[in-house]
């Protein structure tokens, strides 16, 4: 088993749980696997496929994901193919013939195509196992429900002797139970890997408005020169606006959302995978279909609707284990809009609960990673040291006067205002709505003009979290003072607020700027700290040339992590090259000579 792992994938040992899952599947038993993005789920069914007679059938929701997986397998010397509507009939006919003749070890197929072929092609194949990837799509409780997945339950009826492995990166308890029920899994063993991704840094910025977000995004990307990233936006129009802003600043960007033609979406994805653009500005539709291992950053322009969605989306970064950064912007406007969506949905109580947990993460003043892990049932007593709260623990001050000013303005407006107009009143802005409604005559008009608007938005988020007011979602999102707020307003209680740090001070504390080519030693990546940045860039250039020759994404030739290891260890023979973790026999023979010749020039 280990020899096969080394030969095809280049690894000397398994990651946690992988060997147990593989042995369980080799015993022809069903399994449900929960493992984070980048945790090594694919090997859990790809290795058994190589060790078993016949063909493994892998159900995947997106053609682009199938393409990526098949290219990766073929680059490792493994016979694999994808049966889908993007192929012409000749190509699909050839694939069907190869399956019936047992020439493929893995066949990737969509749920719709699987059902169409269930009584035809699949009956004529020797199937070693079924793998249901992105299995959370089968559950209406999951965050990415796809109705066509619900018919996968027919597999055990038609092929009772074939084991099924269902895999997902995120699924809470109710979703796990639904997956097992819908697929009719037979006494499955549930494998739950640690959801911790220590290589991902976690940062939240609260109360930012559009201009401030744009500046923060540009500063953030400037710390990642030439490195790929994704910006998730709540709306299509916002994705387009952000992409235009980046383009004007000379950052090559693409847009991806459901309103574009499939050709435009495919083009955007292809440009991103092949490093022709640095950033993709997208709605939640983007990301599941890619296996790009060297995404170095993910930004959420808006608050996601659930921790599952958030975790899956930040999981696009750092799949190769290298240091990667995530940034979430959080505002009251997002919270109000998402609450409305959740209230109007068919699953109001569940969606509101999920949103509340996401809100708790964004407002946290304790280690953010502990909150994420706790949500997935994994408790830890240690802080991560790699989130903004751990790096810069919050300091508090007596903010009673600030809170009283805000609550007084709410009270004097007869609790008939939302957050936007409240900030205008406090700042003394003569907006049309303020003057039309006579709020410029209030005693509190301009009472907080010394506090920047962004800080007011942050303080209002804190006040909401502290329970000083509530949002009446059924009354145009007006703010209503609570009993706790009344106590502060009339001096019966004091209010402690978190000090808002200026960006410059935060960066000075963090000392965060790092070169794109040098791994951060503190992170548990197992990487030596002796590599040459110059050699790494030369290796990256060679990798790009080889990838272009084969019309492959660069990360499929060799991952960034492998390039870092090559740069640090500098193998001077093909045999030494093949000993690097992540380089299998096929890649050693195919690429060893050219990479070793280049490395010798730097030795």
Regions found by a protein language model. Name each.
Residues 1, 350-352, 381-603:
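Accessory DNA-binding and partner-docking regions appended to nucleic-acid-acting proteins
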Residues 1-8, 12-16, 20-42, 50-52, ...:
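Helicase motor core with emphasis on the C-terminal RecA-like subdomain
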Residues 25, 221, 272, 362, ...:
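Short helix-to-turn junction characteristic of helix-turn-helix DNA-binding domains
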Residues 347-376:
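Short, charged low-complexity linear segments at domain edges
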């Amino acid at each position: 088993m280990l020899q096969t792992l080394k030969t095809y994938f280049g690894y000397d040992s398994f990651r946690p749980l992988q060997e147990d899952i593989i042995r369980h599947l080799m015993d022809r038993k069903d399994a449900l696997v929960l493992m984070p993005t980048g945790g090594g789920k694919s090997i859990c069914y790809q290795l058994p496929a190589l060790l078993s007679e016949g063909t493994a059938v892998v159900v995947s929701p997106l053609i682009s994901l199938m393409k990526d997986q098949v290219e990766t397998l073929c680059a490792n010397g493994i016979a694999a193919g994808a049966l889908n509507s993007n192929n012409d009939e000749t190509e699909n006919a050839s694939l069907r013939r190869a399956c019936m003749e047992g020439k493929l070890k893995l066949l990737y197929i969509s749920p719709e195509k699987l059902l169409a072929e269930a009584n035809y092609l699949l009956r004529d194949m020797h199937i070693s196992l079924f793998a249901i990837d992105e299995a959370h799509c089968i559950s209406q409780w999951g965050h990415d429900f796809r109705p066509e997945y619900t018919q996968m339950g027919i597999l055990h009826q038609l092929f009772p002797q074939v084991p099924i492995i269902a895999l997902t990166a995120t699924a809470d308890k109710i979703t796990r139970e639904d997956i097992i029920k819908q697929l009719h899994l037979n006494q499955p063993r549930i494998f739950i890997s640690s959801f911790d991704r220590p290589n991902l840094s976690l940062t939240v910025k609260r109360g930012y408005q559009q201009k401030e977000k744009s500046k923060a995004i540009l500063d953030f990307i400037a710390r990642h020169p030439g490195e790929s990233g994704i910006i998730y936006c709540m709306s299509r129009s916002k994705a387009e606006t952000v992409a235009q802003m980046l383009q004007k600043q000379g950052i090559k960007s693409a847009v991806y959302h459901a309103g574009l033609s499939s050709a435009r979406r495919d083009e955007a994805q292809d440009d991103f995978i092949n490093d022709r653009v640095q950033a993709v500005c997208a709605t939640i539709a983007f990301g599941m279909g890619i296996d790009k291992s060297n995404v170095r950053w993910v930004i959420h322009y808006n608050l996601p609707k659930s921790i599952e969605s958030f975790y899956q989306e930040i999981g696009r970064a750092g799949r190769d284990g290298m240091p990667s950064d995530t940034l979430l912007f959080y505002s009251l406007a997002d919270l109000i809009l998402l609450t409305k969506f959740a209230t109007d949905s068919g699953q109001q109580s569940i969606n509101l609960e999920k949103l509340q947990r996401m809100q708790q993460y964004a407002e946290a003043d304790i280690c953010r990673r502990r909150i994420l892990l706790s949500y997935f049932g994994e408790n830890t007593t240690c802080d991560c040291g790699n989130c903004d709260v751990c790096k810069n623990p919050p300091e508090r001050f007596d903010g009673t006067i600030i809170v009283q000013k805000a609550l007084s303005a709410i009270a004097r407006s007869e609790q008939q205002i939302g957050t936007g107009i409240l900030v205008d009143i406090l700042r003394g802005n003569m907006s049309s709505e303020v003057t039309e409604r006579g709020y410029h005559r209030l005693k509190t008009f301009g009472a907080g003009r010394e506090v920047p608007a962004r800080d007011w938005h942050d303080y209002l988020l804190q006040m909401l979290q502290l329970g000083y007011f509530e949002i009446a979602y059924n009354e145009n999102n007006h703010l209503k003072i609570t009993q706790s707020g009344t106590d502060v307003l009339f001096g019966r209680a004091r209010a402690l607020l978190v000090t808002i740090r200026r960006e410059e001070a935060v960066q000075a504390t963090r000392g965060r700027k790092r070169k794109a080519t040098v791994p951060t030693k503190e992170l548990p990546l197992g990487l030596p700290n002796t590599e040459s940045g110059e050699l790494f860039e030369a290796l990256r250039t060679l990798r790009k040339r080889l990838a272009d020759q084969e019309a492959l994404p660069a990360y499929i030739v060799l991952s960034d992590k492998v390039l870092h290891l090559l740069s640090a260890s500098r193998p001077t023979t093909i045999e030494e090259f093949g000993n690097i973790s992540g380089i299998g026999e096929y890649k050693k023979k195919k690429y060893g000579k050219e990479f070793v010749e280049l490395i010798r020039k730097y030795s």
